[in-house]
């Protein structure tokens, strides 16, 4: 049992490393990619328009995406809240917001195989708390923030 758990943790860490490396290959730091995917102060955003930007980077239709209607600085502030276990049940760098924010969840309505330039989405808007995973900033990030959000772990 012990070796299997260790192997699965190593695989998860390798997968996380690959995701972070992919974000870097796209010319973005993990925190910059987090901001592109999840931070948008326009509470009336149009999912079809905003998701085009994300899908252009990915070159595929993303099935679901959550936008937080808050500032990046406010999301960074959440990194100062007590840390806890992330949804992967392994990482312990997740932090819950202390107040609810407006969110928009964009859910794909077109087929996933649709060309990424033609994806269509349905919005769902609500007011929720959120959880972010935070890491020390990279050298390419602003020195203003020593710790930055790199992953939206969920909303509640």
From Swiss-Prot:
Gene transcribed to yield this protein: Ear2
Species of origin: Mus musculus (Mouse)
Matching Gene3D superfamilies: Ribonuclease A-like domain (3.10.130.10)
InterPro entries given in the database record: RNaseA, RNaseA-like_dom_sf, RNaseA_AS, RNaseA_domain
One Pfam family, short name: RnaseA
Binding residues for substrate: 62-66
Domain remark text: The N-terminal region is necessary for mediating chemotactic activity.
E.C. designation(s): 3.1.27.-
PANTHER family with a match to the protein in the record: EOSINOPHIL CATIONIC PROTEIN, RIBONUCLEASE
Family: Belongs to the pancreatic ribonuclease family.
Sugar-modified residues: 89, 96, 107
Annotated signal peptide: 1-25
Keyword Nucleotide-binding included in the entry's annotation: no
Function (record text): Cytotoxin and helminthotoxin with ribonuclease activity. Selectively chemotactic for dendritic cells. Possesses a wide variety of biological activities.
Database matches in PROSITE patterns: RNASE_PANCREATIC (PS00127)
GO BP term (any one): chemotaxis
Gene Ontology molecular functions: endonuclease activity; nucleic acid binding
Coiled coil: none
Disulphide-bridged cysteine pairs: 47-106, 61-119, 79-134, 86-94
Main localisation: cytoplasm
Catalytic residue positions: 38, 151
The protein, known as: Eosinophil cationic protein 2
Compartments where found: Cytoplasmic granule
CDD domains the record matches: RNase_A_canonical
Keywords: Chemotaxis, Disulfide bond, Endonuclease, Glycoprotein, Hydrolase, Nuclease, Signal
